[in-house]
């Protein structure tokens, strides 16, 4: 009877995963229709819905198992046998690696994230040699120009499944040919071989054609973002052929793509050639398998810990008033723990901080907010923690610590991509770098605001600079929707003495924001003030912010470009 129960539990979990991934594919398959209908609000809702599917189905399976087992507690041997039986169901299973993550999630939900050991759940994959094997159905089609690049592109684009007419396809093809010829020599292009993914990658208001360009043994990305105009006609906005550009398109600060992937491991392996700087975790996350991306992130962390003797240290930069942040000197991620007590000037609660981080997970991050992975009962060997960090942990987060003697358990933390704090970057920057950083910072604020996100605390220390020089927001404890804020002009003083008073001469409500004050705390440095006024002086005007609010209330969804505006074909035509 017990053996049958173990079998039933294993099969119930796998069937639950089948149901979840089926719904995942169903929501994803609707991306083309939403794009063709220009139903951008439905795009946003589908993104949130797909993110919630995973936890919803984990919850359904957990309730089933509680009913099946009558909520009995099982010993270690029983749980190990369930995992063994589950593993035996996976050898011919097409998505076994994500099924392993689903098993982990069910286990963690049942046992409150306790006893996370390899004998009970899939800390490591059961079949690492099978993860990126050959697949029966090709993911891409091959095209060779044979001296007629324009003709080949015509064939590629006419072969797409999109059912809308083109605005001016021959014009767009001319632009693509021009971009390719500017990027590569005739000698390189003589051996050109294109591989075009069968499925389009949908995100925001664009459908991306994703391909590879093979030239004399070298491989380059070939990315075409397809948009529509107001008449419902298609146009291609640019052509990207560098790995740095592709890395930004698939960046950790962007929403997940909607791409139909019955075999995600195969897609991850296919993408790896054009995104060599992306980890396995980042690639799974980019195509919407963010929960498995979390599993892979943890495995990458374990691999680093195993190969390194570094100690965890307090992260460089200004210490936060809400979060304690630490890292490993050579690791590309940071760890963030919500403090037990906040600084007096922070009027937020622990629950509100958790809500803010969840909001960021579900919202369109427009390339300006870092994605995070959330972990519970995170175990660290005590000897790997520097004395300074250990003291900081014991002082700032004692309620979230459990001391096991040789190990420390942190009950809740976030893992996030490591960046250079913007304030530290600006201190070391030359004039051109400083100007570029201010331009990026202002663009980040404006793009977040257009996506209905107000950062709250806009100090430079709350932003980071990526390896591609992009500025990304990463301090979420004060974020809110733009539509919740009351942007006000500062009233003129009643008397000359008003300006000298320590208290304002006007009333201030909790949601009031005075953009004129931004100049005071952002522009104390003369050079910074000059660059800011030159490029983003409108951020100091309440009317600018109110105008954005009105566009949001009117239902307008802004375009989000994963490349600079000057790279758009429409901008080239103007120049």
Curated annotation (Swiss-Prot):
GO CC terms, sorted: cytoplasm
Enzyme Commission number(s) from the entry: 2.7.11.5, 3.1.3.-
Keywords: ATP-binding, Cytoplasm, Glyoxylate bypass, Hydrolase, Kinase, Nucleotide-binding, Protein phosphatase, Serine/threonine-protein kinase, Transferase, Tricarboxylic acid cycle
GO MF entries: [isocitrate dehydrogenase (NADP+)] kinase activity; AMP binding; ATP binding; phosphoprotein phosphatase activity; protein serine/threonine kinase activity
InterPro entries in the cross-refs: AceK_kinase (IPR046855), AceK_regulatory (IPR046854), Isocitrate_DH_AceK (IPR010452)
Active site residues of this protein: 371
Reactions mediated catalytically: L-seryl-[isocitrate dehydrogenase] + ATP = O-phospho-L-seryl-[isocitrate dehydrogenase] + ADP + H(+)
Keyword Cell membrane: no
Annotated GO biological process: glucose metabolic process; glyoxylate cycle; tricarboxylic acid cycle
Coiled-coil residues: none
Localisation per UniProt entry: Cytoplasm
Location (main, coarse): cytoplasm
UniProt-annotated binding residues for ATP: 315-321, 336
Family, as annotated: Belongs to the AceK family.
PANTHER family attached to this UniProt entry: ISOCITRATE DEHYDROGENASE KINASE_PHOSPHATASE, PTHR39559
Function, as annotated: Bifunctional enzyme which can phosphorylate or dephosphorylate isocitrate dehydrogenase (IDH) on a specific serine residue. This is a regulatory mechanism which enables bacteria to bypass the Krebs cycle via the glyoxylate shunt in response to the source of carbon. When bacteria are grown on glucose, IDH is fully active and unphosphorylated, but when grown on acetate or ethanol, the activity of IDH declines drastically concomitant with its phosphorylation.
Protein name stated in the entry: Isocitrate dehydrogenase kinase/phosphatase
């Amino acid at each position: 009877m017990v053996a049958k129960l173990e079998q039933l539990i294993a099969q119930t979990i796998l069937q639950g995963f089948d149901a979840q991934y089926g719904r995942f594919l169903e929501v994803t398959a609707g991306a083309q229709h939403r794009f063709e209908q220009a139903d951008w609000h439905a795009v946003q809702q589908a993104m949130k819905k797909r993110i919630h599917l995973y936890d919803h189905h984990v919850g359904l399976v957990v309730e089933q198992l509680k009913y099946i087992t009558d909520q009995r507690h099982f010993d270690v041997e029983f749980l190990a046998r369930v995992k063994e039986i589950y593993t035996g169901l996976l050898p011919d299973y097409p998505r076994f690696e994500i099924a392993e993550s689903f098993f982990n999630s069910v286990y963690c939900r049942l046992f409150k994230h306790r006893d996370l050991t390899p004998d009970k759940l899939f800390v490591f994959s059961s079949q690492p040699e099978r993860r990126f094997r050959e697949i029966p159905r090709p993911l891409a089609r091959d095209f060779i120009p044979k001296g007629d690049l324009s003709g080949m592109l015509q064939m590629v684009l006419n072969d797409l499944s999109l059912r809308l007419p083109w605005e001016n396809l021959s014009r767009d093809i001319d632009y693509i040919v021009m971009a390719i010829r500017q990027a590569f020599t005739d000698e390189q292009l003589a051996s050109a071989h294109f591989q075009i993914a069968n499925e389009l990658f949908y995100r925001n208001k664009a459908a991306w054609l994703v391909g590879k360009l093979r030239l004399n043994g070298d491989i380059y990305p070939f990315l075409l973002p397809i948009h529509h105009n107001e008449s419902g006609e298609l146009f291609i906005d640019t052509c990207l052929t560098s790995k740095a550009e592709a890395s930004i398109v698939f960046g950790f600060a962007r929403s997940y793509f909607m791409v139909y992937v019955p075999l995600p491991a195969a897609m991850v392996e296919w993408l790896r050639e054009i995104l060599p700087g992306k980890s396995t975790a980042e690639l799974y996350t980019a195509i919407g398998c963010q929960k498995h991306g979390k599993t892979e992130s943890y495995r990458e962390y374990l691999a680093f810990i195993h190969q390194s003797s570094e100690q965890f240290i307090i992260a460089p930069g200004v210490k936060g008033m809400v979060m304690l942040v630490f890292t490993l000197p050579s690791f590309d991620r940071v760890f963030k723990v919500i403090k037990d007590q906040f600084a007096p000037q922070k009027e937020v609660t622990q629950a509100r901080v958790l809500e803010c981080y969840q909001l960021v997970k579900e919202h369109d991050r427009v390339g300006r907010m870092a994605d995070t992975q959330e972990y519970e009962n995170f175990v660290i060997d005590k000897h790997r923690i520097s004395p300074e960090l250990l003291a900081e942990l014991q002082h700032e987060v004692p309620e979230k610590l459990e001391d096991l003697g040789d190990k420390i358990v942190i009950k809740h933390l976030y893992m996030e991509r490591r960046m250079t704090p913007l304030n530290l970057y600006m201190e070391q920057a030359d004039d051109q770098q400083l100007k570029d950083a201010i331009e990026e910072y202002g663009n980040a604020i404006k793009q977040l605001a257009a996506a209905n996100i107000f950062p709250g605390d806009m100090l430079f220390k709350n932003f980071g600079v990526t390896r591609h020089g992009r500025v990304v927001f990463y301090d979420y404890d004060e974020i809110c929707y733009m539509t919740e804020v009351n942007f006000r002009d500062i009233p003129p003083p009643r008397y000359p003495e008003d300006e000298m008073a320590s208290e304002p001469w006007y009333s201030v409500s909790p949601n009031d924001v005075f953009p004129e004050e931004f100049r005071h705390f952002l522009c104390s440095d003369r050079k910074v003030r000059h660059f800011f006024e030159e490029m983003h002086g409108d951020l100091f005007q309440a009317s600018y912010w109110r105008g954005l609010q009105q566009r949001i209330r009117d239902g307008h969804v802004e375009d989000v470009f994963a490349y600079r505006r000057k790279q758009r074909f429409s901008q080239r035509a103007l120049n």
